[in-house]
């Protein structure tokens, strides 16, 4: 602290010679190459979420998402909260890689999720007007005849992240003492970054002579918080039909436990010592039992808990669900569609109550009357007017080999494919003959895309020579070192 002076002018610089470095530079988004990927209206998830969440800009009217990881799923939900119509989501794998509770939230709001699908093209003259997707086979190749197009004005690309680790790797080649944390070390949830940051801090302290130990539990917690979600399990449906109690709609083991901490009577537990296990309710009718406070509903980030209350009417119990969209058009007495966990329609009912807990930010509790046979299946609601987006009558023809791989130098996929087919296997040679990777970003965006082209051409990674990265130190204009200020006359 104190090294950077906010009042310093642009023509000054400070040399810092640290004994130890901690790099926590985060991650950058992976790009995806397809015809039309440079059209205005094609966003990375980070830029889109910055506009919507931080700047409060309604960045689209009709949005299509490519990528079913947590980033894409959560961005889609944020778009719906902002009043943006989410037309659909395409995921190339047979199952979304993000948490199932997040995918279920989108499905319950009418978003169609197309698994085993890829994007073929974004279409439009000077901006995005539609997107064309296609089903893929086991080798992720598009299946002819399965193309379909959807009208949209925005395409959101959320196909993963790459660590910003160039500085770390280069610093280690110079034998500098460097430790990394967060996504700069490995892509994981923000909760994992908190622990990798603690570990990096202790490692740096030890490198400076501290004897403070690093608790083994920290490493164990990083492993848990960084783990991939498990396969969905069969949902446990409670058999009791008396009193009031929570029903859990989460069926996938993920590192999540806020419901256990918020219950004032400590009636929600996670078996064992692993927070990835599914929660259970331990209340006993006639004994220590749920009071229906609803705290577990509104704390759950996956909206995967409902309350079923038989106390007033056992034939038509009251079901309480958490709701996070705009409520100005939702009134007591309104008809709504009730849905199961994955968005299947169970029928229609009416809203009997709306609670707005003061302790929760923009989360309300909507109460419904549901028949006893369906009450424990209800996981959410949808306004009856909500409809899933239908594909256009005909798929839009997508373009061929002119997709831009290197945006800095405007190098197309066709140019690079041609060189690969000629026998080029060295990224440095490709850079020399095509200028791909020679731009201002230093190949940070296009390198992964070029490697993907090698894979598509069937070239093993062992045959590809990586490019030579720029030196550790950043290029600096000579005038800065001379302390010279340029004027309009220069």
Label the model's feature ranges.
Residues 258-277, 295-312, 335-337, 341, ...:
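Iron-sulfur cluster-binding cysteine motifs and their immediate structural context
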Residues 319-326:
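Short alpha-helix capping/helix-loop boundary micro-motifs
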Residues 289, 326-329:
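Residue-level "contact hotspot" at macromolecular interaction interfaces
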Residues 1-247, 251, 262, 314-317, ...:
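Residues forming the flavin
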Residues 344-358:
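Short beta-strand-centered aromatic/proline hotspots
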Residues 356-370:
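Short, solvent-exposed secondary-structure boundary/capping segments
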Residues 205, 341-343:
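Short, surface-exposed secondary-structure boundary micro-motifs
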Residues 231-283, 289, 294, 300:
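N-terminal cysteine/histidine-rich coordination modules
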């Amino acid at each position: 602290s104190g090294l950077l002076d906010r009042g310093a002018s642009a023509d000054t610089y400070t040399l810092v010679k640290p004994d130890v470095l901690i790099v926590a530079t985060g991650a950058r988004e992976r790009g995806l190459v397809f015809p039309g990927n440079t059209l205005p209206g094609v966003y990375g998830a980070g830029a889109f979420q910055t506009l919507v969440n931080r700047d409060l800009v309604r960045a689209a009217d009709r949005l299509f998402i490519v990528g079913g990881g947590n980033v894409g799923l959560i961005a889609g939900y944020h778009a719906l909260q902002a009043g943006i119509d989410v037309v659909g989501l395409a995921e190339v794998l047979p199952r979304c890689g993000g948490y199932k509770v997040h995918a279920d939230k989108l499905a319950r709001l009418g978003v169609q999720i197309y698994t085993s699908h890829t994007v073929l093209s974004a279409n439009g003259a000077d901006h995005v007007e539609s997107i064309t997707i296609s089903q893929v086979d086991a080798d992720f190749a598009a299946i002819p005849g399965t193309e379909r197009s959807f009208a949209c004005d925005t395409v959101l690309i959320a196909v993963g992240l790459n660590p910003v680790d160039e500085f770390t790797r280069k610093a280690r080649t110079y034998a500098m003492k460097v430790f990394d944390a967060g996504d700069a070390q490995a892509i994981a949830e923000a909760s994992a970054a908190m622990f990798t940051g603690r570990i990096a801090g202790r490692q740096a302290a030890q490198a400076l002579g501290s004897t403070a130990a690093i608790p083994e539990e920290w490493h164990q917690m990083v492993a848990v918080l960084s783990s991939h979600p498990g396969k969905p399990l069969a949902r446990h449906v409670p058999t009791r039909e008396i009193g009031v109690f929570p029903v859990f709609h989460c069926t996938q083991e993920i590192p999540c436990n806020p419901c256990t901490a918020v219950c004032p009577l400590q009636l929600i537990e996670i078996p064992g010592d692993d927070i990835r296990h599914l929660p259970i309710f331990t209340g006993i009718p006639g004994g220590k039992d749920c009071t229906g406070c609803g705290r577990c509903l509104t704390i759950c980030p996956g909206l995967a808990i409902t309350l079923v209350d038989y106390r007033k009417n056992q034939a038509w119990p009251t079901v309480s669900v958490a709701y996070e969209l705009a409520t100005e058009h939702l009134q007591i007495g309104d008809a709504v569609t009730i849905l199961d966990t994955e968005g299947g329609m169970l029928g229609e009912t009416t809203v009997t109550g709306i609670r707005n807990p003061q302790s929760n930010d923009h989360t309300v509790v909507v109460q419904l009357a549901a028949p006893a046979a369906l009450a424990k299946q209800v996981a959410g609601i949808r306004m009856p007017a909500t409809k899933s987006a239908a594909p256009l009558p005909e798929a839009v023809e997508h373009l061929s080999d002119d997709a831009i791989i290197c945006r800095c130098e405007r190098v197309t996929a066709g140019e690079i494919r041609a060189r690969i087919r000629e026998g080029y296997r060295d990224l440095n040679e490709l850079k020399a003959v095509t200028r791909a990777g020679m731009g201002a970003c230093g190949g940070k965006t296009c390198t992964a895309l070029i490697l993907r082209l090698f894979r598509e051409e069937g070239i093993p990674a062992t045959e590809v020579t990586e490019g030579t990265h720029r030196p550790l130190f950043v290029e600096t204009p000579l005038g800065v070192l001379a302390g010279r200020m340029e004027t309009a006359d220069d």
